Amino acid sequence: KHTAKDFHNQSVNPPVVRASTIIFKSMQDIRKTQGKAQKNPTGGHYDYGRQGTSTTYILQKILTKLEESYHVFTTPTGFGAVFLAIFSITRPGDEIIVADPVYSPTRLLTEKFLKEFDIKTIFYNPRDLKTLEKNISKRTKLIFVENPGSNTFDFQDLGKILSIAKKNKILTAIDNTWGTPYFLKPIKLGFDMSIVSATKYYSGHSDVMGGSLAVSKRVFQKVYNAERITGLRLGPDDAYLITRGLRTLDVRLDRHRENAKKVASFLSKNKKFKLLYPFKKNSENFRMWKKYYSGASGLMGLKIKSKNVNSVRKFVNSLNLFGYGYSWGGFESLALHQEFRETG
């Protein structure tokens, strides 16, 4: 809330600076700016709009402090941050190891798209990290974690994964959209890259799309080069809206946590449902969540114990306060039957 205040413009909110061209007074000035950018690539020195403006720079400063990272790159979508992370590290002939229950577009990217570029993906069981270590080879360049896993809500032993990666000198990335750095700070924990879909809790109002990729110092240059090549940069209008949303992130997530706990308590008492959420204290999921997170967000899974698919539709269609649609983390309550979610 108190990061990157704009005393120059004397406005409590940063102005939206839209620019394709950055104007300079002289050739010396543009060369001077380019020299500053080379010496300090995180300092907000731009010579062209594709690199960003002061509006996107302010958001990056706020997120860098929130993540406690070396730097944060912002992308047009959350999945753009996933792509940038993987594209920055992998090359033809490499291998990556990915958590099995990942977000379906991430699986599509790693399982099918990367295969066309001779990049092999091996999926590991989050409940059996021996399968992770067993599949490491000399070609393994990245371990990609999603915590908790989409659909299954498996919480993994992050410390153990980092230990395996460190022992084998492999880079690590985690999709931390569920927890956000408000509840978990992956870079501080030891991850090289931390991904958050800013479309969700960062924005909080279901009116903008964006992504963030926080990085450690040792992978910064690789990601920096990849970002400049791909042009994966968030626009100033979206950056402004996400910055505005971040002002209330703590208040909103605290309320999400309280409401989710009430819903989880209610659902856990019904034998017709299997709750996928870190609620039962005697479960492995709860222990892994408690070990690394300071809180829980509002997204949960629910299995209806019935072989009749119509019972699922009947349940979802009978909800009065929940809309039916994709995404989450906004102001509205949503429900979705995951069977129909193939691509994002």
Predicted regions and their residues:
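Short conserved active-site loop signatures built around small residues
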Residues: K1-V17
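Conserved PLP-enzyme active-site core in the AAT-like
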Residues: A4, H71-N270
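Active-site C-terminal subdomain of aminotransferase-like
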Residues: S26, I30, A37-G44, Q51-G52, ...
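Conserved N-terminal alpha-helix of the aminotransferase class I/II PLP-enzyme fold
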Residues: S26-G80, E111-K112
